[in-house]
């Protein structure tokens, strides 16, 4: 697959009086990915969200919005012919790091100065306290998101 890099000016899209945050920035990137995919006849977009991302998002939504929601492994849209897939949804961070090291991939770190406006670091810390980094416990949490027994919920 050919690598194409597209630079977008997310800051220029920010409305006056609004704060930059990870959610808004990522939605702008997904919008551009969607446009690119449709312009080139693609119907699937693979995103790099992994198990920890999904569980952190679930914790953030539960603890800030009182909502049980995360990021589904497959998200098909009705309004346009695109499906977002998350092929790394069952891989946690240590697994990805091990694989990257074995393959000799170059490591990169997010240096966005706006990441402090996100609750993800706190959610990551809470997830680590909850699971002690144990992959099996993370998988149980992931499975719980998919196996909701509403008869035993308020």
Could you tell me what each predicted segment is?
Residues 1-16:
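A conserved beta-strand->alpha-helix junction
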Residues 105-154:
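The feature marks non-catalytic terminal segments
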Residues 23-95, 141:
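Active-site adenylate/phosphate-handling loop in enzymes that bind or generate adenylated species
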């Amino acid at each position: 697959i050919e690598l194409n890099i597209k630079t977008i000016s997310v800051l220029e899209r920010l409305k006056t009086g609004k704060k930059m945050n990870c959610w808004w920035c990522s939605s702008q990137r997904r919008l551009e990915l969607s446009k690119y995919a449709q312009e080139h006849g693609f119907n699937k977009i693979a995103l790099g969200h992994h198990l920890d991302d999904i569980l952190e998002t679930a914790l953030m939504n539960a603890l800030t919005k009182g909502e049980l929601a995360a990021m589904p492994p497959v998200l098909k849209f009705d309004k346009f012919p695109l499906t977002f897939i998350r092929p790394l949804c069952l891989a946690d961070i240590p697994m990805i790091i091990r694989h990257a090291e074995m393959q000799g991939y170059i490591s990169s770190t997010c240096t966005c100065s706006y990441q402090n406006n996100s609750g993800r670091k706190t959610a990551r810390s809470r997830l680590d306290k909850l699971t002690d980094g144990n992959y099996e416990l993370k998988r149980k949490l992931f499975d719980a998101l998919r196996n909701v027994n509403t008869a035993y919920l308020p």
